[in-house]
Amino acid sequence: MTTAMGAALRRIQLGNALSAFGNGFTVPYLYVYVAKVRGLGAGTAGLTLFTLAVAALIVLPFTGRAIDRRGPLPVAIVGTVSAAIGSLGMGLSGSTPLVIASAAALGAGIAVIQPALATMIVWCSTPLTRSRSFATQFFLNNLGLGVGGLIGGLMVDEHAASSFIRLFGIESVMFLVLGATVATVRLPAAPKVEDAMPTGERPEGAWRALMRDRSMVWLCALGFVMFFACYGQFEAGLAAYATEVTRVSPAMLGIALFANTAAIVVTQFVVLKLVERRRRSRVMALVGLIWTVAWVAAALSGLVHGAQAVATGLLISTYVLFGVGESMLSPTVAPLVADLAPASLIGQYNSAFALVKQLAMASGPLLGALLVGLGLHVAYVSLLIMFSLGITVLALRLGRRLTAAQDNPFVGRTRRAEALAAAGSADSVESADSVEPVESADRVAVAA
């Protein structure tokens, strides 16, 4: 990775961290703000969260083509402006139509930003540095969210709408800071993706080309299961289970969420050293087993009666184990998407995977809240245990479809170097033994 690429990457990650910092001010309080502070009711609050998800689902199918045609930089800037407008509008809105319109702008903007930033990171990294680049982004993102949430909690007053206007105003400014930061980035002229599949004709056939890539389709299926089993449960299913079955207080639930973030921040770079030279498919399979243990701990927390401290400890361990698994996935999944993508379809692949994530994030809370709300607690936890085990099975099956370089770039690079060295040695021996010097010189020239 060149010095210019490193400088560009640092700017991208700085902007992303500041944006996450602003996002942390509002994420924990959006439901309370709409339902209680603005007095619009639980129905409108639920519709607001639904609008955020639907807006993302609408724009993501078109985002990849825009990134591949126009480049990730202008797309990211458009996304930050939309998100900033939506966030500020959310803080100033006092009626249902304005809240929904602001949520649409906010959801669409955030959805556009994610694959654009991912593509910029791919352009500014190499296969050997990509895992560390995405791990650093994930670390900074969680650190920003955690610090922002902590400061936001000190500033918020649910009896004063003005305090929420400040929170959303800060978030809006941070989105604009992200846009201004990435606008100063000097991206490489072309993406540096090795071992890409043949690009074929595009852009009209971009989605068809992606669907023909069986490894990518398999990874998308795996991604849906992963996001459904973890992120898709944080906001609704697991939170409802924790309060209704484990019977922890909302304050203790906040501590559990903080433990999740702390686990990521503390373990990210330790985990990175352990996994970056391992087979990616095996790392994802291990995450499935870790999350299986996490859901078993959650199940046990609901069965411990008369020992609330033990139940609370089990629940917090669930969130900690989720955090460890997340820190293992950050240097694994996003780089694999990039390495599977043809050079001219990086944006399309990133957007497709973001779309899969959004689908899981939309369906996960819906199903989780429904099962817990109906009192089907055993069925809920059993389903998530099966999903977690499914991660392991799907990851191992995916590993059979990947090349050595895709599953482990370090091994792939080593094998290529050994092959080139062996070829060079063979050419040298052949040249030395040749009776005709001119012919041997031709062979060396061709080999070079």
For the regions a language model picked out, list residue spans one by one:
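Juxtamembrane intracellular "pre-TM" segments in multi-pass secondary transporters
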Residues: 1-9, 187-222, 412-424, 445
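Helix-loop boundary and gating motifs at the non-cytosolic
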Residues: 3-54, 217-257
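Helix-breaking motifs and short loop linkers at transmembrane-helix boundaries and internal kinks
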Residues: 39, 71, 92-97, 247, ...
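Conserved MFS/SLC helix-loop-helix module at the cytosolic interface between two early adjacent transmembrane helices
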Residues: 57-94
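Helix-to-loop junctions at the C-terminal end of transmembrane segments
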Residues: 59-71, 156, 266-281, 372
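Structural signature of the two symmetry-related core transmembrane helices
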Residues: 74-89, 282-298
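Cytoplasmic helix-loop-helix junction between adjacent transmembrane helices
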Residues: 102-143
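C-terminal membrane-cytosol helix-exit motif in multi-pass small-molecule transporters
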Residues: 153, 173-194, 393-399
